[in-house]
Amino acid sequence: MKKTIMASSLAVALGVTGYAAGTGHQAHAAEVNVDQAHLVDLAHNHQDQLNAAPIKDGAYDIHFVKDGFQYNFTSNGTTWSWSYEAANGQTAGFSNVAGADYTTSYNQGSDVQSVSYNAQSSNSNVEAVSAPTYHNYSTSTTSSSVRLSNGNTAGATGSSAAQIMAQRTGVSASTWAAIIARESNGQVNAYNPSGASGLFQTMPGWGPTNTVDQQINAAVKAYKAQGLGAWGF
């Protein structure tokens, strides 16, 4: 399928201006006029935009830490990549749940992604193949160490989601793992006739729950609005 990509439009939206990458120079967010909040939003909620075009023309190497996550955006002028992960392996201080590593990343042009892109002008025609964004939720053990009296657990995916919730809310990962175990038994696609769905059984008003990322975002919104009372605590 032929598709025209306006690569510069994403750069304008992000406010990436006034920077020319030199050989071997790594540009941190502070060195260029970058809207960090918008980049973070793209990484968590609009991966398709980052997959479709680089954030600016030419080579760049941008890294910054925000809200407990390390964000990376790089390009050699021909291919580009982006990723985010928990900064500095921040799993210390979370009790009762095995340490987790959470990474979302996309590497345009890599062997794994099987995407072809020929960088020309910002209005060039490109031949592209749809590529997935990888979401890696993993724990060092095969199951959660939180187990309720009825046998429910948070499961591997739920334990990783609990770690991320702890980083984003300040509530312990063990508390979130217990909520996940009680609400969904660690089932990502759990659905209740009331309309509640996902690991955290959030209602539609808090946002979509098609992916684990969306389920985490919806749970964060519910927590910010109602605290743990959203889950009856």
From Swiss-Prot:
Stored InterPro entries: Lysozyme-like_dom_sf, Transglycosylase_SLT_dom_1
Cystine residue pairs: none
Subcellular location: Secreted
Keyword RNA-binding: no
SUPFAM superfamilies, per the entry: Lysozyme-like
Signal peptide: 1-29
Main localization, broad class: secreted
Enzyme class: hydrolase
EC number: 3.2.-.-
UniProt keyword list: Glycosidase, Hydrolase, Secreted, Signal
GO cellular component terms listed in the entry, alphabetical order: extracellular region
GO molecular function per UniProt: hydrolase activity, acting on glycosyl bonds
Biological role stated in the UniProt entry: Is able to cleave peptidoglycan.
Family, per entry: Belongs to the transglycosylase family. IsaA subfamily.
Record protein name field: Probable transglycosylase IsaA
